[in-house]
Amino acid sequence: MISTKGRYALRVMIDLAEHNDQERIPLKDIAERQQISKKYLEIIVRDLVSSGMISGASGKNGGYKLMRDPDEYSVGEIIETMEGSLSPVACLACEVNDCPRAEDCQTLPLWSEYDTMVHDFFYGKKLSDLIK
């Protein structure tokens, strides 16, 4: 399940994409448009800045801006930045499945197929697909 933090991060990114023609967007403007507490958004944008997805500046002309074009962000990348792996089971969350039961696991193919569907769905959607 995707948390509120993950959903709000996606909304912040959509808002920044919709206003990408401006220099920097003040957090208070995003908070007002998205009807999300500015205090809560401070936590979200801090994580987005530290991950390199957006840039932030304080001061008179401060605010936030996308680091790339909206079509260069996938929804999957944004969500995984905030949530971590979207894999349904721990053994699929790593590059290498080191589960000692992997060879004999009767449910692994099911989880693997589900993981691929979720990954392909979210990574197949670009931020630019979500803007108005």
Regions found by a protein language model. Give the residues of each.
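Key DNA-contact positions within bacterial/archaeal DNA-binding proteins
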Residues: 39
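Beta-hairpin "wing" of winged helix-turn-helix
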Residues: 52-66
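A short alpha-helical element within helix-turn-helix/winged-helix DNA-binding domains
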Residues: 25-34
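Non-DNA-binding regulatory cores of transcription-related proteins
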Residues: 67-132
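Short amphipathic alpha-helical interface segments
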Residues: 9-21
